[in-house]
Amino acid sequence: LTNVFPNIVEKTKVDENGLEYFIKVTDNINQKNESKSKIAEKIFSFKKPIVTYSLIFICILVFILMYVLGNGSTDNYTLLVFGANVDTLTKNGDYYRLFTSMFLHIGILHLLCNMYSLYIIGKEVENVFGKVKYLIIYLLSGIAGSILSLAFNHNTICAGASGAIFGLLGALLYFGYYYRTYL
């Protein structure tokens, strides 16, 4: 070995005795693990999903109001009055429908499926990204979903939080890939 690597003895020589060197290396490893542990603890510590609960509350409240103030969540006129997305109105200047439609749901099953999905996925995304980033992801994804809905559904009333929820799922997939060493 010394023939191949003539400087190996000088390079591997340690001034400390073996035990002191072992303790020093172990301490360095422990410090690095402790700092990584703090990062993981910060990322994965549970926080109350207030934004998720608020979004669910808003969707349920709007659903109830559609029955109290209109003819229910499956009535086309009521959906349009409450801000459902339809290409003829949105393209003629009712751009608010890109936003409002993500809080409307057509029928109880649509509402229940979306709110269950929002609860399961939303609380995780809110926990790892924080309240502000979570809300930004939700709203931008919902608007993007509304725009895509306009592109593919002509003369069709569109509503629901599915676009926003798929955006949250995408954010969760990104998180899983980016932080895969912590999972």
Positions of the model-derived regions?
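A detector for small-residue-rich transmembrane helices and their helix-helix packing motifs
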Residues: 1-183
